[in-house]
């Protein structure tokens, strides 16, 4: 029984990893098609440190 459970768990883990990878690939493809989402991400990265600085000052 333990061996069967281990095999089932291994299959579930592999399936979840594959689904996550496929979702990330789909997002990357959409970003390449749009080209705007990448710019937004860069702007967000620039704004984050400024917000942190303001918190430190307060």
Curated annotation (Swiss-Prot):
GO CC field: plasma membrane
Protein name listed in UniProt: SPbeta prophage-derived uncharacterized protein YonT
Organism encoding this protein: Bacillus subtilis (strain 168)
Region of interest (Disordered), ranges: 35-58
Residue spans crossing the bilayer: 6-26
Compositionally biased tracts (Basic residues): 36-58
Topology versus the membrane: Single-pass membrane protein
Keywords assigned by UniProt, alphabetized: Cell membrane, Membrane, Transmembrane, Transmembrane helix
């Amino acid at each position: 029984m333990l061996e069967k459970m281990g095999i089932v768990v291994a299959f579930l883990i592999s399936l979840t990893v594959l689904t996550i990878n496929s979702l990330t690939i789909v997002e990357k493809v959409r970003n390449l098609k749009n080209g705007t989402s990448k710019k937004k991400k860069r702007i967000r990265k620039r704004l984050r440190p400024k917000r942190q600085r303001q918190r430190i000052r307060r």
